[in-house]
Amino acid sequence: MNNTVLILKNISKHYSQGKTIVRVLDDLNLTVNEGELIAIIGSSGSGKSTLLHIAGLLDKPTNGQVIIPNSKYQKYHLIRLHYLGFIYQQHHLLKDFTALENVIMPRLISGLDQKEAIEDATKILDDLGLGKKLYNMPGELSGGEQQRVAIARSLINKPKIILADEPTGNLDPKTTNEVFNLFLKVAREQNTAVIMVTHNHELAHKMDKLYKLKHGLLNIA
């Protein structure tokens, strides 16, 4: 039986707009097990990104609990560094560092072995079709290539959970499929869970579970 890696329990997120209370998330629950591929769809403004931010300990819910069972870390910044991987549609690469250096940066911040980090990063970048561009600067890469570097960076610390917000939005269908295959590989080989927000319904239906976020709640789609 797979171990649970994330529990969102009775999560609510409310905002005030004048005298009106906007309920973005409303008593939402989600349990994520290791190795699961989860897709979340929903209309623009439905709260998908807010949900990812709360799950990733980047935002606090108005009510409810984010539980990460069996984590040996208590401080949020350490959980984010060692336990979680983040991918956004905007890649936020460091422009003065090569593709390879961008990918190994989280591993070096963690104080882990540089040689092993380079070997792992080279393998991931090669799996994403960037084996010949390890030493290119971000400005020398296309938008899709830059996004693949960002995806590789999210994987370098072998996180328990990857939180991906429209990770393939700027990618062509072939590269989108390569990204899915990489997610599938880390899920099956490393038991990494992936929670992905996407508007790509074809990609969403390839995942193990598909949820739709509507009126602040998640429902099986």
Curated annotation (Swiss-Prot):
Domain named ABC transporter: residues: 6-220
Membrane topology summary: Peripheral membrane protein
GO molecular function: ATP binding; ATP hydrolysis activity
InterPro entries per the UniProt record, alphabetical: AAA+_ATPase, ABC_transporter-like_ATP-bd, ABC_transporter-like_CS, MacB-like_ATP-bd, P-loop_NTPase
Main localization of the protein described in the UniProt heading: membrane
Binding positions for ATP per the UniProt entry: G42, S43, S44, G45, S46, G47, K48, S49
Enzyme class: translocase
SUPFAM superfamilies linked to this entry: P-loop containing nucleoside triphosphate hydrolases (SSF52540)
SMART domains for the chain: AAA (SM00382)
Cystine bridges: none
Any Pfam family matching the protein: ABC_tran
Cellular component GO terms held in the UniProt record: plasma membrane
Record's subcellular location: Cell inner membrane
Keywords (A to Z) from UniProt: ATP-binding, Cell inner membrane, Cell membrane, Membrane, Nucleotide-binding, Translocase, Transport
EC number: 7.6.2.-
Domain of life: Bacteria
Family affiliation: Belongs to the ABC transporter superfamily. Lipoprotein translocase (TC 3.A.1.125) family.
Oligomer status and interactors: The complex is composed of two ATP-binding proteins (LolD) and two transmembrane proteins (LolC and LolE).
Function: Part of the ABC transporter complex LolCDE involved in the translocation of mature outer membrane-directed lipoproteins, from the inner membrane to the periplasmic chaperone, LolA. Responsible for the formation of the LolA-lipoprotein complex in an ATP-dependent manner.
The protein's name in its UniProt record: Lipoprotein-releasing system ATP-binding protein LolD
Species for this entry: Rickettsia felis (strain ATCC VR-1525 / URRWXCal2)
